């Protein structure tokens, strides 16, 4: 399984770049061709990359953890402090500094005030709404460096991993099914600006890791079907 994960790292990273490449400059071009390509290459084909990254994170976090221990939990937090938190802070500080430099050079006030919210949810990503139960769902948010919402959510999930482990350990597939229903039915109200996408796919990967499922090996047997399905789906998208 690990060899498949290593092989996927670069392609998935490239797909994430595709997601964020269809920016304001491209959307400002009045062209149906550009709009169509942007929709397919940025908003359609690569959308599975981020969920898969969450699933891989969950798999790797729990692959060697059949039983929970606070010692192991603290060790994992210590490693994530250097691999997640420090880079997260640094890149958000750099982003804020660049935005501030732009405002100052234009003789304007800072449009982003200096506060903790720069590192949490100063940017609104989605829109507000209501779910099927009529509950109010607030907009999802991101830090000043918008793509790093993934890292923010992942850090929160890692902190909550003892709870997720308990759910999977004692409720097993039922706990996974409950989270899936809440996610796909849109019942989660985006508490703190966080969607449930990270929790759901992290738990899905964690479930595979805890049970040592060789997902990559099983899917490799069906690669011709996957390839044909991809070609057909891509053709249908182009024909829209």
Where are each of the predicted segments found?
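Membrane-embedded alpha-helical segments of multi-pass membrane proteins
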Residues: 11, 45-56, 147-159, 195-204
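Solvent-exposed interhelical
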Residues: 155-180, 207-225
């Amino acid at each position: 399984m690990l060899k498949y994960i290593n092989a996927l790292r670069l392609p998935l990273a490239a797909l994430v770049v595709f997601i964020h490449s269809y920016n304001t400059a491209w959307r400002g071009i009045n062209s149906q061709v550009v709009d169509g390509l942007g929709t397919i290459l940025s908003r359609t084909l690569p959308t599975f990359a981020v969920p898969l990254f969450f699933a891989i994170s969950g798999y790797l976090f729990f692959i060697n953890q059949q039983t929970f221990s606070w010692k192991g939990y603290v060790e994992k937090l210590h490693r994530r402090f250097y691999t997640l938190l420090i880079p997260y802070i640094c890149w958000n500080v750099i982003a804020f500094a660049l935005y501030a430099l732009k405002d100052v050079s234009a003789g304007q006030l800072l449009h982003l005030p200096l506060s903790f919210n720069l590192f949490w949810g100063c940017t609104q990503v989605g829109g507000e709404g209501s779910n099927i139960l009529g509950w109010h769902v607030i907009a999802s948010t991101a830090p000043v460096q918008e793509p790093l919402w993934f890292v923010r959510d992942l850090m929160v999930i890692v902190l909550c991993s003892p709870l997720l482990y308990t759910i999977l350990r004692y409720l097993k597939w039922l706990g996974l099914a409950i989270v899936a229903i809440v996610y796909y039915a849109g019942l989660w109200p985006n508490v703190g600006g966080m969607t449930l996408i990270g929790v759901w796919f992290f738990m899905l990967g964690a479930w595979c890791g805890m049970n040592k499922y060789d997902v990559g090996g099983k899917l490799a047997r069906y690669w011709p079907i996957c390839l044909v399905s991809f070609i057909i789906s891509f053709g249908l998208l182009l024909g829209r």
